[in-house]
Amino acid sequence: MMYFIYLLSVMLVLSFMAFASNPSPIYGGLSLVLSGGVGCGIIVSLGGSFLGLIVFLVYLGGMLVVFGYTAAMATEEYPETWVDYTVVLNLAIMVGMLGVVWYEFFEEVDLGVGYDLLDLGGMEVLGGDFNGVSLLYACGGWELVFSGWILFLTIFVVLEVTRGEH
């Protein structure tokens, strides 16, 4: 399980680096959605299954609005991809800087695999976050409805703004 969490952590860092070196806003939105999914996967792996699901749904709704806006406002006929020379060079520079920072802070290159970082007990898939479900629906249910309604209206605002005068 720790190897899986380590793999998800590496994927999270790589997705953030993909966002930082995005050649086109479309790929930037895609990498943000992927990083949100990987981050919620880490939360689920650590036992927060309901929290990971709620965060993923709210984050995915917000990112769909942002992704729709960037796709509508910045459409290019031939967008740059991640295999272009400048993008690969920027990504290589970021990987090198990350390696230097890692070496300076930790004095050696140690991946940390095999250490017991968390006391997960029996390694349950379903964690203790189900205790907060009743509290979420009792006190925070209207906040979820309100947030969903705002995201729903934002989609229509983005579509109206990007419709243009055709």
Swiss-Prot record:
The keyword Mitochondrion appears for this protein = yes
EC number(s) reported in the record? 7.1.1.2
Which Gene Ontology biological process is one annotated for this entry?
Answer: mitochondrial electron transport, NADH to ubiquinone
Tell me where it resides. Answer: Mitochondrion inner membrane
Question: Transmembrane stretches, by residue range?
Answer: 1-21, 26-46, 47-67, 86-106, 139-159
One GO cellular component term, please give it: mitochondrial inner membrane
Q: Which Pfam families match?
A: Oxidored_q3
- Which catalysed reactions does the entry list for this protein? a ubiquinone + NADH + 5 H(+)(in) = a ubiquinol + NAD(+) + 4 H(+)(out)
* Keywords, in A-Z order: Electron transport, Membrane, Mitochondrion, Mitochondrion inner membrane, NAD, Respiratory chain, Translocase, Transmembrane, Transmembrane helix, Transport, Ubiquinone
Please give the function described in this protein's UniProt entry: Core subunit of the mitochondrial membrane respiratory chain NADH dehydrogenase (Complex I) which catalyzes electron transfer from NADH through the respiratory chain, using ubiquinone as an electron acceptor. Essential for the catalytic activity and assembly of complex I.
Q: Which family does it belong to?
A: Belongs to the complex I subunit 6 family.
Listed name of the protein: NADH-ubiquinone oxidoreductase chain 6
